Amino acid sequence: MSLKQRYRETIQPKLLKDLSLSNIHEVPKVLKVTVNRGLGEAATNAKSLEASVNELAQITGQKVVITRAKKAIAAFKIRQGMPIGCAVTLRGDRMYAFLERFINLALPRIRDFRGVSPKSFDGRGNYTVGVREQIIFPEISFDKIDAIRGMDITIVTSARTDEEGRALLREMGMPFRSN
């Protein structure tokens, strides 16, 4: 059973009851997942940007957008408009497929993994987790990478509070660390 199907059939009714909501449309849901990678070395090394774009495209299965500097910062040797990172926004079926792979395949492959921090919510039910190495994803071959780079994964939900967002992600299978 896919994550989307499981959400509709089991998670949504359970959250409706657990959060004591009156309408099925009030139940929090995942709106989008943003995968972002900032590349400081892209200012000097164009190959790293190209490699990052290819890696994110492999991981997400979607076209990657190159993010550019809004302002020139002399201390970082960056001019306005220079590429400094890349990002992908996933919605719909691709989002659910990515979340399922991330929760069930990628997270358990992290070394010394004891769960993700339950404190990384932003106050509005959105969750961000930083990944230190891209090789936890099964799509990335260790032999083909030039350097180990991390990324930020933000899960944007329709939850109004952190507790609602935490309940949603816990039901989806996100392994939160118990402090």
From Swiss-Prot:
Any Pfam family hit: Ribosomal_L5
One BP annotation, GO: translation
Cellular component, GO annotation: ribonucleoprotein complex; ribosome
The organism's place on the tree of life at top rank: Bacteria
InterPro entries given in the database record: Ribosomal_uL5, Ribosomal_uL5_bac-type, Ribosomal_uL5_C, Ribosomal_uL5_CS, Ribosomal_uL5_dom_sf, Ribosomal_uL5_N
Keywords: Ribonucleoprotein, Ribosomal protein, RNA-binding, rRNA-binding, tRNA-binding
An example molecular function term from Gene Ontology annotations: tRNA binding
The UniProt record lists the keyword Repeat: no
The protein's role, per its UniProt record: This is one of the proteins that bind and probably mediate the attachment of the 5S RNA into the large ribosomal subunit, where it forms part of the central protuberance. In the 70S ribosome it contacts protein S13 of the 30S subunit (bridge B1b), connecting the 2 subunits; this bridge is implicated in subunit movement. Contacts the P site tRNA; the 5S rRNA and some of its associated proteins might help stabilize positioning of ribosome-bound tRNAs.
Known partners and oligomeric status: Part of the 50S ribosomal subunit; part of the 5S rRNA/L5/L18/L25 subcomplex. Contacts the 5S rRNA and the P site tRNA. Forms a bridge to the 30S subunit in the 70S ribosome.
Entry similarity comment: Belongs to the universal ribosomal protein uL5 family.
Protein name from the UniProt record: Large ribosomal subunit protein uL5
Organism: Synechococcus sp. (strain CC9311)
